[in-house]
Amino acid sequence: IRGGAGMRVLLVEDETVLRETLKARLVEAGFTVDVAQDGEEGVFAGLEYPLDVAIVDLGLPKLPGLEVIRRLRAARKTYPILILTARDNWQDKVEGLQAGADDYVAKPFHFEEVLARLQALLRRAGGWASPELKCGPIMLDTRAQTVKVADAAVDLTTFEYRILEHLMLRAGEVISKTELTERLYDQDFERDSNVIEVLVGRLRRKLDPQDELKPIETLRGRGYRFALARDQASR
């Protein structure tokens, strides 16, 4: 997947493995990557480098991620900022957005989700339309978190939306029930993979009431696959 198009991104992350993995994937996607290992380095790099976008972990040593964001915004740095949160915690999200961040990704995440968020932020920063994922007649707006099938709005619950977004981001790939379960729950909650079967069943009925599109395939013992190909324009 490529989508960086030479854009310069600052990655502020203290976890070595995650930092190096993300950096490698971002470079592979076409980004030029600067890295910082703590909050103080992040502020310095964020002020000194000509950036297009920044990724900031909230749990940083020396200076918390929220303070990094506040200082960059106080210095009138207007490039988009994507925050990484330790878990799907509403308070982290709210505080991050209030500090000046533009979007968030909760751990654990897949790189495809990070890339989609970055591309969305860069499109908006460039004054482009809100980014959409399109697979056949199914259109998912990653910013507004809305879904349409053949231009007709489909009402989804939060959990249904999360499942659909994850499947569409990785259209054509086999996604295990375990992986989908991790997309739904905080790490502290007891996970029930049977819930995934229920949600996928509801998604099928809502997206494909006539059973014509068959957008979500079940692969017994392996998981699920979104069977409709992604449009090139939505990559």
Task: List each model region and its residues.
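Short, Lys/Arg-enriched segments at the junction into DNA-binding effector domains
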Residues: 8, 119-174, 178, 226-232
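Positively charged, aromatic-enriched patches within helix-turn-helix-type DNA-binding elements
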Residues: 146-222
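N-terminal/domain-start alpha-helical segments
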Residues: 1-128
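Short, flexible hinge/linker loops that cap or flank conserved catalytic cores
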Residues: 2-4, 75, 127, 132, ...
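Glycine-rich nucleotide-binding loop
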Residues: 41, 221-225
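A short, glycine- and basic residue-enriched loop/turn
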Residues: 15, 57-58, 66, 87-89, ...
